[in-house]
Amino acid sequence: MINRFLLAILFTLVLSGSASANEMISIEKYLSDKDPSDHAATTYSLIRCSGLELFFATIMQEKAPDVSKFSKQKSSEFALFASKLDSVNSNRKFEDSAKNMINSSQEIMSYYIKDGKKNWSKTGSYFLESYIDDDRLLCDYLYKSYIQK
């Protein structure tokens, strides 16, 4: 009886370890059930893009310092845009919104790092064949269409 119990626990641990979920879902999936006029969802999407760019800056720092620097700049621009939007829609002081957005961006970056490492161990890429690549495409579109002017 005890052996069956231990075997069941071991089996559960093995299954849970191999089926480890990602820290986040894609931005597009997150937005799929949100109203287009939902300012909180828009702000979250922008700050996700900021965190994603910090993630890219981190993984590119040694091999491509220029790319890393540009990703940091893009991260700052996304965070600034999100801070302005948050400040206007929440009636918070801009400084408070900016502090919140920067902290959120750094936390989101840590989730991308965790998921990127998991993806690296499976595919040899930090982001290809994962939601991270989908986020990259969406954030590139947002940057070119709305941020970079």
Identify what each model region corresponds to:
Residues 17-22:
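Sec/Tat signal peptide C-region and signal peptidase I cleavage site
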Residues 35-91:
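Short N-proximal segments of mature Sec-exported proteins
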Residues 30-31:
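Short, charged/polar, low-complexity loop and linker segments
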Residues 26-27:
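Buried hydrophobic residues that stabilize the cores of well-folded domains
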Residues 1-7:
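Bacterial N-terminal signal peptides that target proteins for export
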Residues 74-149:
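Compact alpha-helical subdomains of small soluble proteins
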Residues 7-16:
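Bacterial N-terminal signal peptides
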Residues 15, 43-44, 133:
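Processing junctions and N-termini across compartments
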